[in-house]
Amino acid sequence: TERLVKLGNNVKAFTLYNSFNSKGWLDYCDKDIMKEFEIFSGDIRDLGSVRAAAKSCDIIIHLAALIGIPYSYHAPQSYIDTNIKGTQNVLETARDFEVENVIHTSTSEVYGTARFVPITEEHPLQGQSPYAASKIGADQIAMSFYTSFEIPVSIIRPFNTYGPRQSTRAVIPTIINQITDGQSRLNLGALH
């Protein structure tokens, strides 16, 4: 969001409504930058919310998802509702509003355990957790809107990412923090 604003884009952010009026990580954005974009609170699972947020948008960068593999075993329905139904809502809205492009953010988890490396787009999809299965479902819905309705969709499947405000539970921030803390030996836990 910050980078798009700095590049001069007209940005609208869609955040999950909550009674605390928290905007999630956007609460930590530079206040001057926050003045430069619109924040719309709603729920990705609600088509009306998605339509209201996407009104007058040319491009949709779809990042909304329930993430976290462990919790998906306890609440698989929540992952299906958010990740699959939410993606369908985005795509239906994009079709109705004739959006120029939808960038759908998936995950490398859709590949499961690597059968070969490097992993390519031809690698089989393996839903090894409810989270991964829900993202596979979302990807397939996105592909179906491309083939059925010619909605321009790009699916990205990031592996390890890093950036501002990222949880230190992820591997790259863990390594970066240990290096900046001056540790001479990295502690990454069990690697076997």
Which ranges hold each PLM region?
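A conserved pocket-lining segment of Rossmann-fold NAD(P)-dependent short-chain dehydrogenase/reductase
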Residues: 72, 123, 151-164, 174-192
